[in-house]
């Protein structure tokens, strides 16, 4: 218990020293704002260069194993044409979470629209059960992007943050303390 009190008192003392001078406090706040704006600019550049609304996604389920595992981070690109066998990320109307699956087959309708059927590599049946009740095919507007690369397991932190709120609050608390103490 004494250790916690010592750490708390040390933190309060450091915060008082940091914000005693108004210029230093303002400098810390401006540095944080610049950091956030830089991250936003990088994200927007990725959106422009890849043509995808979400150029980076995390695999949330095991439906694509052994190719992609839960927590893998995928880099996406919006190609002009999709082929059977491509791994795509798509989003169905009314669902918030995008799905990462492979294109099983595709065909062109009479009005020259592409229709796609998807399936997870680890699933026994195609994805028609996931689509809207009277929808049998995906269309191009459902596809968010084509997987062009991945980084294994780096997205597991995202999954933990969403599944365990304690992890989210711990990370946010640590970041706030580091920002306020002047660690940039």
Curated annotation (Swiss-Prot):
One of its GO terms (molecular function) is serine-type endopeptidase activity. Disruption phenotype: Causes a reduction in parasite growth in the host erythrocyte. Reduces levels of the mature form of SERA5 but not of PEXEL-containing proteins. It is found in: Endoplasmic reticulum membrane. One of its GO terms (biological process) is signal peptide processing. Phosphorylation increases catalytic activity. Ca(2+) slightly increases catalytic activity in vitro. Residues 50-184 are lumenal. Phosphorylated. Phosphorylation increases catalytic activity. The chain crosses the membrane at residues 29-49. The active site is at 63 (charge relay system), 101 (charge relay system), 127 (charge relay system). Keywords: Endoplasmic reticulum, Hydrolase, Membrane, Phosphoprotein, Protease, Signal-anchor, Transmembrane, Transmembrane helix. Residues 170-181 are annotated as: C-terminal short (CTS) helix. It catalyses: Cleavage of hydrophobic, N-terminal signal or leader sequences from secreted and periplasmic proteins. InterPro entries: LexA/Signal_pep-like_sf, Pept_S26A_signal_pept_1_CS, Peptidase_S24_S26A/B/C, Peptidase_S26, Peptidase_S26B. Its EC number is 3.4.21.89. Its main location: endoplasmic reticulum. Pfam families: Peptidase_S24. Residues 1-28 are cytoplasmic. It is a single-pass type II membrane protein. Catalytic component of the signal peptidase complex (SPC) which catalyzes the cleavage of N-terminal signal sequences from nascent proteins as they are translocated into the lumen of the endoplasmic reticulum. Specifically cleaves N-terminal signal peptides that contain a hydrophobic alpha-helix (h-region) shorter than 18-20 amino acids. NCBIfam families: sigpep_I_arch. The C-terminal short (CTS) helix is essential for catalytic activity. It may be accommodated as a transmembrane helix in the thinned membrane environment of the complex, similarly to the signal peptide in the complex substrates. This is Signal peptidase complex catalytic subunit SEC11.
């Amino acid at each position: 218990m004494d250790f916690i009190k010592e750490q708390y008192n040390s933190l309060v003392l450091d915060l008082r020293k940091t914000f005693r001078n108004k210029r230093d406090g303002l400098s810390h706040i401006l540095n944080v704002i610049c950091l956030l704006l830089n991250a936003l600019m990088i994200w927007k550049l990725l959106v422009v260069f890849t043509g995808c609304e979400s150029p980076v996604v995390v695999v949330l389920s095991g439906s694509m194993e052994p190719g992609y595992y839960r927590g893998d981070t995928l880099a996406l690109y919006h190609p002009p044409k999709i082929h059977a066998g491509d791994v795509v990320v798509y989003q169905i109307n009314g669902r918030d979470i995008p799905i990462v699956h492979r294109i099983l087959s595709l065909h062109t309708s009479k009005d020259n629209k592409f229709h796609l059927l998807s399936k997870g590599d680890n699933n026994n049946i195609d994805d028609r059960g996931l689509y809207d009740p009277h929808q049998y095919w995906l269309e191009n507007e459902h596809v968010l992007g084509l997987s062009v690369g991945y980084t294994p397991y780096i997205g597991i932190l995202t999954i933990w943050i969403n599944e365990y709120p304690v992890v989210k609050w711990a990370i946010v608390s640590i970041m706030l303390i580091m920002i306020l103490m002047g660690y940039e």
